[in-house]
Swiss-Prot record:
Belongs to the HIT family. A motif (Histidine triad motif) lies at residues 244-248. SUPFAM superfamilies: HIT-like (SSF54197), mRNA decapping enzyme DcpS N-terminal domain (SSF102860). Substrate binds at E154, K176, H237, Y238, Q239, P240, S241, F242, Y243, H244, L245, H246, V247, H248. InterPro entries: DcpS/DCS2 (IPR008594), HIT-like_sf (IPR036265), Scavenger_mRNA_decap_enz_N (IPR011145). It catalyses: a 5'-end (N(7)-methyl 5'-triphosphoguanosine)-ribonucleoside in mRNA + H2O = N(7)-methyl-GMP + a 5'-end diphospho-ribonucleoside in mRNA + 2 H(+); a 5'-end (N(2),N(2),N(7)-trimethyl 5'-triphosphoguanosine)-ribonucleoside in mRNA + H2O = (N(2),N(2),N(7))-trimethyl-GMP + a 5'-end diphospho-ribonucleoside in mRNA + 2 H(+). The hydrolytic product 7-methylguanosine diphosphate (m7GDP) efficiently inhibits the decapping scavenger activity and acts as a competitive inhibitor in vitro. One of its GO terms (cellular component) is nucleus. This is m7GpppX diphosphatase. It comes from Ascaris suum (Pig roundworm).
Amino acid sequence: MVDEVDANSTGDNSLVNMKGFSFKEVLGSDSARKSAFILLDSSNGENAILLADKNAFPVDKTSWSAILTGSTLKPIMKNDIYSSYTLCMPNEFSDVKSTLIYPCNEKHIAKYRDQKRFIINETPEDYRTITLPYIQRNQMSLEWVYNILDHKAEVDRIIYEETDPHDGFILAPDLKWSGEQLECLYVQALVRRKGIKSIRDLTANDLPLLEGIRDKGLNAIKEKYGLDKHQIRAYFHYQPSFYHLHVHFIHVSYEAPASGVAKAVLLDDVINNLKLIPDFYQRSTLTFTAKEQDPIYRREN
């Protein structure tokens, strides 16, 4: 499932020739996650963004036997029993997981450009007078979301589907996950109901929806991948990258982008808060991080 970007998924597994694109700029990188975000020019003059992430290492004996058989070590230094090398692995183990956003717009470019980050404490009044008007003016297209919900795209990737129009959702892998290493599992639930932008819109009336996503989503993950519910973190982003309610499910050992403090809000915490105070998220000050050039940050300051 696509997360954070607009995309048209056709299910076509044919190779894409990159000769029609040329390098323009490195927007950002993440050395800890071995990721890079590259701005490209296309032959027709439109911009594109390539998100490149090195795949996690395999953990099975067969793969490592093949790696050891087909690899060479290029020496860097040696000191007593300790040696440093560059491991030159076979091509089949050196693929880079990538997502192409094409065509992209200035909002996408700003999203992936490295910037200073700041903490925002958003009061209910701030949300009504600053954040909500910004969302209404600047929401990126949700066509890719509706394509998934309407079975126009990514049908073959659906893990579980609840068809109820009010409390239903679709669970599918996020494009950040290669689908191979379970310790990097990343799937996402998209709610069927339109109009719920984020946790700010949730009330106790939405508890059946949220509990259904949690319970049915975790059961579906266990059935397909064999992972127990205690091995999965389920959370929302606030602010989310797109304003149609969705829930992230990741392996508890995986430090996914934006899964930490001041960005991720646990699904169980949201459920518990709404049970205690039915309109908790309309009354609370919510804390999140924003980039320096983010219009929400500029308006707040």
